[in-house]
């Protein structure tokens, strides 16, 4: 698990505009069941300079409120390496012990997430998202 790029929201505004246009803000998602699938023409990982491949990746755009408990996706038709792009981060509920930023967990390691961070992680290993507020994300899945 690592941050591949940061500040993507400033450097790749056209990507963010396209993804945010397709975010259904009235739906709270658990990523797998309620995500909006992007069906447009943009190959986001190519636009972000991560992969220079012709075929598109499956893109799921989600609004998440609260934490996602530790889980393993391990979806057979997708490669284990997936990319998560943070579209926006809402304020936490600001409890006295609230975190300042959402935290992605995998393999005993935590990474704090900011708007515009592009993170690569292994979907077939246990991972979790800890946050007491809202976070909008796009997840890019590559077919095997």
Predicted segments, located by residue:
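Non-heme Fe(II)/2-oxoglutarate
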Residues: 1-55
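Short beta-strand-to-coil "C-cap" segments at the C-terminal boundary of structured domains/repeats
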Residues: 141-144
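Catalytic core of non-heme Fe(II) oxygenases with the double-stranded beta-helix
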Residues: 52-128, 132, 136-138
């Amino acid at each position: 698990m690592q941050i591949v790029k940061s500040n993507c929201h400033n450097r790749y505004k056209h990507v963010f505009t396209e993804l945010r246009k397709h975010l259904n803000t009235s739906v709270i998602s658990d990523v797998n069941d309620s995500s909006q699938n992007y069906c447009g023409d943009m190959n986001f990982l190519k636009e972000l300079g991560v992969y220079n491949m012709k075929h598109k990746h499956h893109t799921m755009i989600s609004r998440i409120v609260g934490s996602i408990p530790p889980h393993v996706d391990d979806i057979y038709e997708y490669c284990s390496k997936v990319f998560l792009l943070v579209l926006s981060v809402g304020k936490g509920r600001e409890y006295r012990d609230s975190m300042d930023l959402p935290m992605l967990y995998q393999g005993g390691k935590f990474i704090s997430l900011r708007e515009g961070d592009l993170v690569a992680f292994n979907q077939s290993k246990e991972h979790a998202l800890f946050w007491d507020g809202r976070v909008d994300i796009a997840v890019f899945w590559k077919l095997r």
